[in-house]
Amino acid sequence: MEEWVEKYRPKSLNDVAGHNKTKESLIEWIESFINGQKQKPILLAGPPGSGKTTLAYAIAKDYAFDVIELNASDKRNKDVISQVVGTAATSKSLTGKRTLIVLDEVDGLSGNDDRGGVAEIIKVLKTAENPVILTANDVYKPALMTLRNSVNLINVGSVHTNSIPPVLRKIALKEGFEIDEKVIKTIASHAGGDLRAAINDLQSLATGGSIEVEDAKELPDRDSEKSIFDAMRIIMKTTHYDIATSATRDVKEELGTIEEWISENLPKEYLKYKDLANGYDYLSKSDVFLGRVFRRQYFGLWRYASALMTAGTALAKEEKYRGFTRYAPPAIFTKLSRTKGSRQRMKDILKKIALKTHTSTKRARNTLDYMVVVFESNEAVSAELVEYYELTKEEIEFLTNKTIAKNIFSVIAGKKPKVEKETPKKKKKAEDVVPIIPKRPKISEPPKEPLKEVIEETVEKTDKKEKEKKDPKKQATLDSFF
């Protein structure tokens, strides 16, 4: 059975439900392209089922463009994008029509199968002569950071709940079955702004043979792909406990990540110092509970951390703040991406120290702190440390600076014996030969001793021994034993 989503996909922008501003922007963009004005590619960003791909196909149909699409089910690595997209971006189709290139779900590019895909897309976009439309569910993924600078971003919001029932009625009429108005409204409310999900639910009920209100109420809520930006808006704007705690329930992010988002955007929303202080106070208490979860491995504390960071932050303000606030991803994520190389170099240094000291890299960091002090104060000792831990000049420059690294390695170079190159011996001239006169060995003079006293002492001892032999009755003295 054909899916109704494809069967009743709008063929024209006029048939697309809602998105009036987005449609106007797309019309202006495509007409400028047709008139010869160079335009940046369009990136349509929005939740699943909001109609991003439908908008791309509808505008292609309205302006008679052929479509070449690569979606998440296709392999989209560097070679595929270069061959398929790269060729299509600079040529016409076989029918002579202009070509619209659609790259669907570019935020899904990941893993070995899509290696190098984003970089190749950016390269293709710079030379593209045909219009390109990209779609993404989460445009703020780190992998798309460089891509965002090469496109015009258009946010496509969820389809309004009131725009879904007319579409469902139209499909039911064409399929030839009657449906109660309450059933239509129930399906629409469960869809959570996802028109595609609403159509699939309608088809599911119709093929099941029962289209009653009770059956519609048993449908699962489809708001499972709620954006982190929606969660931020709810938490920052509401003053109700239940609404705040449910804001992150369907967001597929860890609590630690949500905490970073709230911490980043609190100062953007809370303009009163008291509100801001109260908000960070609740957030700090949430962080304490998160720490206890990991330290004790008791995950029952999750709910306390979640309530403190959502409801606690929401109720920290005295009243709602009106007006639009532009929320942003945590700056720490961007910083971590930028400092990835530096952190890897530090890991390599710590591994060398840990290997020599037979400790962990965590303990090696304490050793490194003292080593840096030595590097900056004592070049001789530093040279020995560098040789022992087998550190490179680049690593010392990373820890200190180029001057200190140069001085330390100069000391190391001075300790090594110089290997002189052998030069061919020249024949010496007669006048260059210097006669070598061997030095006479020094004759050491005997120590001056009182010779007379030595002789007299020897004679006296001899006479004494002879006398003792002649008189055996007399007891010998102890001197005879020596």
From Swiss-Prot:
- Where is the region Disordered? 420-482
SMART domains named among the record's database cross-references: AAA
Residues involved in ATP binding: 46-53
- At the top level, the lineage of the source is Archaea
Q: Does the keyword ATP-binding apply?
A: yes
Which protein family is named in the record?
Belongs to the activator 1 small subunits family. RfcL subfamily.
Q: Which organism is it from?
A: Methanococcus maripaludis (strain C7 / ATCC BAA-1331)
Q: What is this protein called?
A: Replication factor C large subunit
Q: What does this protein do?
A: Part of the RFC clamp loader complex which loads the PCNA sliding clamp onto DNA.
Q: Where is the composition biased (Basic and acidic residues)?
A: 442-476
What taxonomic classification does the UniProt entry list for its organism? Answer: Archaea, Methanobacteriati, Methanobacteriota, Methanomada group, Methanococci
Subunit structure as annotated in this protein's UniProt entry: Heteromultimer composed of small subunits (RfcS) and large subunits (RfcL).
Question: What is the primary gene name for this protein?
Answer: rfcL
Q: Which keywords accompany this UniProt record?
A: ATP-binding, DNA replication, Nucleotide-binding
GO BP annotations, alphabetical order: DNA replication
- Please list the GO terms describing molecular function: ATP binding; ATP hydrolysis activity; DNA clamp loader activity
Q: Which Pfam families match?
A: AAA, RCF1-5-like_lid
